Each structure stands twice: as structure tokens, then as C-alpha cells.
Amino acid sequence: MMTTLLLAVHLAGAEPPANYPTPNMLIEANDPKLKDVRVLDTRAKAKYEAGHVPGAVRADAAPWAKAVLANKADAEFWKAELAKVGVTPTKPVVVYSDDVRDSARTWWMLKLAGVPDARILNGGWKAWTAAKLPEEKAETVATAEPHNWKPDPNRLADKTHVLDQLKGGSTCVDARTKDEFTGEKAFAKKSGHIPGATHLEWVELLDPKTDKFLPPADLIKLVKDRKIDLDKPAVTYCQGGGRAAVLAFGLELAGAKSVRNYYPSWGEWGNADDTPVESKKK
């Protein structure tokens, strides 16, 4: 009870949220609405037990990621998994971690599952502790009545989709480091990038001091400077889907109408025999 009261006091002085082109994707640590959402903590169990956002449910998203990669994350899978952590279609879900790649990956999987309102806690656990907000150590257990989710296939791109998109001139955006993009560094048989891809490393979307997403004007300027057309369908990719999820989130936050995450990413593309590659090795 005391923790709840302290949390309410801290949240009472919240500042209004930033005005991004796509609203209700981010939530600040001091936002009063956090009292009325399902909060998921995707950090390691030991970190959760050491202290977490009051009322947060620990969600182990690793099995979700494996199922998505294996093409086994169907409606029945999400029906069982999301019920375990108390996710319902009527309550917003807020995800946080100590690494925005984990938060974004989980956000993206929730959207893939068909969750209508999923958001990221801006700045994650770092922002929560920086604001000196209350913490608790007691585990929160929350279950929900299993729901028949309708997964959204438009969130996911596979290799065939990307190959087809190349013919249609869609936007591919590479979230990896510059050395990975140019081919100087490789974690697959082939090095380089998908032909015609635009390079926008995932960390560029964030304030390095706070781990928060750039303010609206700065985010939009960054995207426009890279000549990314937010009205065209976009595909993001990296090595294994996590960095690409950050980029997918950032592009949608900036106003992109259609963004897919090529989840197998370079781990598949760079090892396949039928995929074209561009390289800018010196």
C-alpha cells in the first residue's frame, strides 16, 4: 500500500508527453497512466528480483523470440503465452528493460501477436531509477483469461518478401553498425548489405545519455536526412532482429505508415545462396 501511495505522489507531477507523429507508443516514467496499464519487465530474473517497477510482471520473452524465428508463433501460441503475463486486449501494455533492444523486440512481438496498445517505457529502467521513483522486490503474478489473438502478418518480413520488395523499390533500412553495412565486418558467410538499403544505425535514434528516443523534431530530421520516405513501405533488418525492432519502432514513432521487421535478418540473408548483396569495402 505504501509503495502504491508513493508511486501516486511521484506520478502526480508528470510532464505532458512529447508530441510524436504516431502517439501512444512511448510513455514516460512519471506518467500517471502507468497506474492503469500492464507493465512487463523483460530483464533477467535476478535483476527483476533486485528491484522493479511496482506492479510489473516479469516476462521472459526469449521463448517468444525463438518461436517467431521458427515460424511457430501462431494464434494458439500467443493465446497461451500472453495469458501467463496478464496481457488482455483491453488494457495497454508497457514494456521496459535495461536495454532498449530487448524492450523494442518485445514491443514488436506484442504487435505481431495482435496486441492493440503496446508501448515502451522511454529510457527503460535507467529512466525509472534516474527519476528516483519507487521500486519493489516482491514478485507480481498476473494471469488473464486466454484471448484469441489475431496475429498481424504485416509486422513481419521474410526472405521472399524482401526479395519481392527489392523489385518494387521499397525501402530497406539497415540498423547495424557502419562496418557491418559496408562489409568491413561480417557475422555471416557474406558481408555487406541488402542492395539499395539505407543505413541508419539503431543507436542514432537515442539520446546516448538517457537512452530515451530523440525528441520528435530531431527524430523526424534524422529520418528525413537519410532520405527515408515514411509514406513508403519499409523493411528493417540487422543481424538477428533486435536492433531492427528498435529501428521499426523509431520509424513508426516518426510517422511511418508501414514497417516490417525482417526478423531473421542478416543471419539468414548473409548465409543464403539466393540473396543479392552490395558491399562498400575499401
Placement of each model-derived feature along the sequence:
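Hydrophobic h-region of N-terminal signal peptides that target proteins for export
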Residues: T3-E15
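Short, hinge-like loop/turn segments at secondary-structure boundaries
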Residues: E135-A138, K189-K190, P276-K280
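C-terminal soluble interaction/assembly domains
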Residues: K221-L222, R226-K282
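Active-site-proximal beta-strand/loop segments in catalytic clefts of secreted hydrolases
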Residues: T42-R43, A59-A62, Y96-D98, L121-G123, ...
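Phosphate-coordinating loops and pocket residues in cytosolic domains that bind phosphorylated ligands
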Residues: A50, A130, N271
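Positively charged, proline/Ser/Thr-rich regional signature most characteristic
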Residues: P16-T90, L163-D231
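Thiolate-centered catalytic microenvironments shared by cysteine-dependent enzyme domains
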Residues: G13-P21, A67-L69, A73-T160, E184, ...
